[in-house]
Protein backbone atom coordinates (compact mmCIF):
# COMPACT_ATOMS: atom_id res chain seq x y z
CA UNK A 1 0.00 0.00 0.00
CA UNK A 2 1.38 3.38 -0.99
CA UNK A 3 1.56 6.23 1.45
CA UNK A 4 0.33 9.67 0.56
CA UNK A 5 2.91 12.01 -0.84
CA UNK A 6 1.21 15.36 -1.34
CA UNK A 7 -2.26 16.86 -0.97
CA UNK A 8 -3.50 19.81 -2.96
CA UNK A 9 -6.78 21.39 -1.91
CA UNK A 10 -8.89 24.09 -3.48
CA UNK A 11 -12.35 25.54 -3.03
CA UNK A 12 -14.27 27.15 -5.85
CA UNK A 13 -17.59 28.96 -5.91
CA UNK A 14 -20.33 26.65 -7.19
CA UNK A 15 -20.38 28.48 -10.53
CA UNK A 16 -19.72 26.92 -13.97
CA UNK A 17 -16.96 29.36 -14.90
CA UNK A 18 -14.72 28.05 -12.10
CA UNK A 19 -14.71 24.40 -13.23
CA UNK A 20 -11.99 25.27 -15.77
CA UNK A 21 -9.64 26.25 -12.92
CA UNK A 22 -10.00 22.77 -11.45
CA UNK A 23 -9.30 21.24 -14.88
CA UNK A 24 -6.12 23.32 -15.29
CA UNK A 25 -4.86 22.39 -11.84
CA UNK A 26 -5.63 18.72 -12.44
CA UNK A 27 -3.88 18.78 -15.80
CA UNK A 28 -0.73 20.25 -14.27
CA UNK A 29 -0.63 17.77 -11.39
CA UNK A 30 -1.30 14.74 -13.60
CA UNK A 31 1.27 15.85 -16.17
CA UNK A 32 3.98 16.20 -13.53
CA UNK A 33 3.11 12.76 -12.18
CA UNK A 34 3.75 11.24 -15.60
CA UNK A 35 0.25 10.38 -16.79
CA UNK A 36 -0.18 9.93 -20.53
CA UNK A 37 -2.05 12.52 -22.58
CA UNK A 38 -5.04 10.17 -22.91
CA UNK A 39 -5.14 9.50 -19.16
CA UNK A 40 -4.99 13.24 -18.44
CA UNK A 41 -7.91 13.82 -20.80
CA UNK A 42 -9.87 11.02 -19.07
CA UNK A 43 -9.11 12.57 -15.68
CA UNK A 44 -10.21 16.02 -16.85
CA UNK A 45 -13.52 14.70 -18.22
CA UNK A 46 -14.36 12.68 -15.10
CA UNK A 47 -13.44 15.44 -12.65
CA UNK A 48 -15.24 18.06 -14.74
CA UNK A 49 -18.38 15.91 -14.62
CA UNK A 50 -18.17 15.62 -10.83
CA UNK A 51 -17.64 19.38 -10.46
CA UNK A 52 -20.41 20.21 -12.93
CA UNK A 53 -22.84 17.92 -11.09
CA UNK A 54 -22.02 19.74 -7.84
CA UNK A 55 -22.45 23.14 -9.49
CA UNK A 56 -25.77 22.21 -11.13
CA UNK A 57 -27.43 20.10 -8.44
CA UNK A 58 -26.02 20.88 -4.99
CA UNK A 59 -27.30 24.37 -4.39
CA UNK A 60 -30.35 26.37 -5.36
CA UNK A 61 -30.26 29.86 -6.85
CA UNK A 62 -30.65 31.60 -3.48
CA UNK A 63 -28.09 29.45 -1.68
CA UNK A 64 -24.91 29.31 -3.76
CA UNK A 65 -22.16 27.45 -1.97
CA UNK A 66 -18.69 26.11 -2.60
CA UNK A 67 -17.24 23.02 -4.19
CA UNK A 68 -14.19 21.55 -2.49
CA UNK A 69 -11.65 19.65 -4.59
CA UNK A 70 -8.78 17.66 -3.08
CA UNK A 71 -6.02 15.96 -5.04
CA UNK A 72 -4.19 13.14 -3.25
CA UNK A 73 -0.88 12.56 -5.02
CA UNK A 74 0.40 9.05 -4.35
CA UNK A 75 3.36 7.29 -5.91
CA UNK A 76 1.11 4.95 -7.92
CA UNK A 77 -2.13 6.89 -8.30
CA UNK A 78 -4.01 10.17 -8.15
CA UNK A 79 -7.08 10.42 -5.95
CA UNK A 80 -9.50 13.27 -6.57
CA UNK A 81 -12.27 14.11 -4.12
CA UNK A 82 -15.02 16.53 -5.15
CA UNK A 83 -17.38 17.54 -2.34
CA UNK A 84 -20.24 19.94 -1.75
CA UNK A 85 -22.45 20.71 1.23
CA UNK A 86 -25.62 21.06 -0.82
CA UNK A 87 -28.56 18.79 -1.47
CA UNK A 88 -27.89 15.06 -1.16
CA UNK A 89 -29.44 12.23 -3.16
CA UNK A 90 -29.73 8.45 -3.00
CA UNK A 91 -26.79 7.39 -5.19
CA UNK A 92 -27.74 3.70 -5.38
CA UNK A 93 -31.28 4.54 -6.48
CA UNK A 94 -30.02 7.13 -8.96
CA UNK A 95 -27.54 4.66 -10.44
CA UNK A 96 -30.25 2.03 -10.75
CA UNK A 97 -32.60 4.52 -12.44
CA UNK A 98 -29.90 5.67 -14.86
CA UNK A 99 -28.43 2.28 -15.87
CA UNK A 100 -27.32 0.34 -17.78
CA UNK A 101 -23.78 -0.13 -16.60
CA UNK A 102 -22.94 -3.33 -18.44
CA UNK A 103 -20.60 -3.75 -21.41
CA UNK A 104 -23.47 -5.16 -23.49
CA UNK A 105 -25.22 -1.77 -23.58
CA UNK A 106 -24.16 1.32 -25.47
CA UNK A 107 -23.88 4.85 -24.15
CA UNK A 108 -26.93 5.73 -26.29
CA UNK A 109 -29.03 3.53 -24.03
CA UNK A 110 -28.31 5.59 -20.91
CA UNK A 111 -31.14 7.60 -19.41
CA UNK A 112 -30.97 11.34 -19.94
CA UNK A 113 -28.78 12.86 -17.26
CA UNK A 114 -26.88 9.65 -16.69
CA UNK A 115 -23.89 10.39 -18.86
CA UNK A 116 -21.85 12.11 -16.12
CA UNK A 117 -21.94 9.19 -13.69
CA UNK A 118 -21.37 6.76 -16.55
CA UNK A 119 -18.31 8.71 -17.73
CA UNK A 120 -16.83 8.91 -14.24
CA UNK A 121 -17.18 5.16 -13.74
CA UNK A 122 -15.88 4.39 -17.22
CA UNK A 123 -12.87 6.73 -17.24
CA UNK A 124 -11.64 6.25 -13.67
CA UNK A 125 -10.32 3.10 -12.01
CA UNK A 126 -12.39 3.59 -8.84
CA UNK A 127 -15.39 5.81 -8.07
CA UNK A 128 -17.12 6.09 -4.70
CA UNK A 129 -20.04 8.38 -3.97
CA UNK A 130 -21.16 9.38 -0.49
CA UNK A 131 -24.34 11.36 -0.10
CA UNK A 132 -24.86 11.84 3.62
CA UNK A 133 -24.35 15.56 4.17
CA UNK A 134 -23.96 16.97 0.70
CA UNK A 135 -22.31 14.80 -1.93
CA UNK A 136 -18.72 13.56 -2.00
CA UNK A 137 -17.31 11.85 -5.09
CA UNK A 138 -13.96 10.11 -4.61
CA UNK A 139 -12.23 9.01 -7.82
CA UNK A 140 -8.94 7.17 -8.31
CA UNK A 141 -6.80 6.81 -11.43
CA UNK A 142 -3.77 4.54 -11.21
CA UNK A 143 -0.53 5.38 -12.96
CA UNK A 144 -0.28 2.69 -15.61
CA UNK A 145 1.93 4.37 -18.13
CA UNK A 146 5.62 5.02 -18.10
CA UNK A 147 6.80 7.75 -15.78
CA UNK A 148 9.60 10.17 -16.38
CA UNK A 149 10.90 9.90 -12.81
CA UNK A 150 10.17 7.50 -9.98
CA UNK A 151 10.68 10.04 -7.18
CA UNK A 152 8.53 10.24 -4.08
CA UNK A 153 7.19 13.79 -4.15
CA UNK A 154 5.63 15.95 -6.80
CA UNK A 155 8.77 18.11 -6.73
CA UNK A 156 10.68 15.11 -8.13
CA UNK A 157 8.37 15.07 -11.16
CA UNK A 158 9.28 18.64 -12.14
CA UNK A 159 11.97 19.07 -14.76
CA UNK A 160 13.00 22.59 -13.73
Swiss-Prot record:
Keyword Flavoprotein: no
Record keywords, A-Z: ATP-binding, Kinase, Nucleotide-binding, Serine/threonine-protein kinase, Transferase
Keyword Nucleus: no
Record field: catalytic activity: L-seryl-[protein] + ATP = O-phospho-L-seryl-[protein] + ADP + H(+); L-threonyl-[protein] + ATP = O-phospho-L-threonyl-[protein] + ADP + H(+)
EC identifiers of the protein: 2.7.11.1
Source superkingdom: Bacteria
Gene Ontology MF term list: ATP binding; protein serine kinase activity; protein serine/threonine kinase activity; sigma factor antagonist activity
InterPro entries registered for this protein in UniProt: Anti-sigma-factor_SerPK, HATPase_C_sf, RsbW
Function: Negative regulator of sigma-B activity. Phosphorylates and inactivates its specific antagonist protein, RsbV. Upon phosphorylation of RsbV, RsbW is released and binds to sigma-B, thereby blocking its ability to form an RNA polymerase holoenzyme (E-sigma-B).
Family: Belongs to the anti-sigma-factor family.
NCBIfam families per record: PRK04069.1, rsbW_low_gc
UniProt-recorded name of the protein: Serine-protein kinase RsbW
Natural source organism: Bacillus velezensis (strain DSM 23117 / BGSC 10A6 / LMG 26770 / FZB42) (Bacillus amyloliquefaciens subsp. plantarum)
Taxonomic lineage of the native organism: Bacteria, Bacillati, Bacillota, Bacilli, Bacillales
Gene name as annotated: rsbW
Amino acid sequence: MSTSVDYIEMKIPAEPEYVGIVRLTLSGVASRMGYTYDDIEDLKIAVSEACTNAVQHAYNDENKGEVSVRFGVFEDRLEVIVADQGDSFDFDQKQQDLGPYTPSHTVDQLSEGGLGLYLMETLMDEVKVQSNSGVTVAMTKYLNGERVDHGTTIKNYETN
